[in-house]
Amino acid sequence: MTVLPNAEWRTRPGLRRIVAALSADGDTVKIVGGAVRDTLLGLAVSDIDMATPLLPDEVMRRLTAADIKVIPTGIAHGTVTAIASGDHHEITTLRRDVETDGRRATVAFADDWREDAARRDFTINALYADPETGAVDDWFGGLADLAAGRVAFIGDAATRIAEDHLRILRFYRFAARFGRGELDAVSHDAVIAARQSLKSLSRERIADELLKILALPDPRAIVGQMATDGIFEVLLPELDADFAAVFDRLLANETETAVEPASLRRLSALLPADPAIAEQVASRLRLSTRQKKHLAAIARHRSDIVRPARQLAHAIGTDGARDIRLLSGDRASARAAVDALDGWEVPALPLKGGDIVARGVTVGPDVARILKAVEAAWVAEDFPGAARAAELADQMIGRTSD
């Protein structure tokens, strides 16, 4: 029998209180999914989810009686969130699928642990553990797959994908995180065969999963595999023909500069340097207005590799300037840009329109024109202080008078 190691999270007071409340009458609660998988792999655990045969109302009653705050976050689907000792834990009643359409599932509550596990996606995610003893339940070979670095669907791969088409993208993400060696052939063939079904998913779900893939420490291999498999023909037809070289340079520069991965920056590496295309992709993926503007700005200025980083930041912000250098620069220029922008904020021009008027310029369009010229010179001189800005204003006004 496989038993969880004595990980720190297993002794947290909040978790112990929840387990005690739900198992007080001899009922069962188990740790499920990622916490079990990651603990077995020796990885840090962030979310500790639980499952129980108790119905949601009974779960809430018991937790409330134990003075544990509980929120009915997804009670229609059997999920509540318990907050104990500052920790948040999702607790879900065992379920079975009644009907699925590739986008959502209609479920019924159940009392069979294996049946609950069978509705999950991959064998490595269908591991359950006793919170007291750490004993691991494995009905579908997840332990062997975890040891082998194999990401495989539970049972029939085509059926699992038909239940939720997002599992196509999840396959690639989990393979990148936990896979070693060749992809599981049966699962891989199934996602390729079903790739057109991605069109049925909401744009938000596609965007969320795609950005998670791009946020992985080094997604180059899996992104290349997705391109080879025709996944991007369905969800990102704008994929640039030369994306691999740009993506490789970006990842190398991120490593060189120790800059944290950013999904949006990496998404821009997959696209042509065309702001219209960037906006088109952002709109289709239902990205926020801020994200849309950021993608477009990167595309518009990606070839601007001569202008000093701080001057570029004045035009499009420090994040945009840094991202452009990481995308388009060599390692030396990327490093120089990151160093120049680190901890630096774009300053405001230390002059206002009133300062121009005070120098004798009549209120009107000349004020804005002179102020714009002063700002351009001030930026070109690397943002000097107020005294130099005033000198520049006097010079510009003098030229106007001449």
Residue ranges of predicted features:
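Catalytic cores of the polymerase beta-like nucleotidyltransferase superfamily
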Residues: 1-402
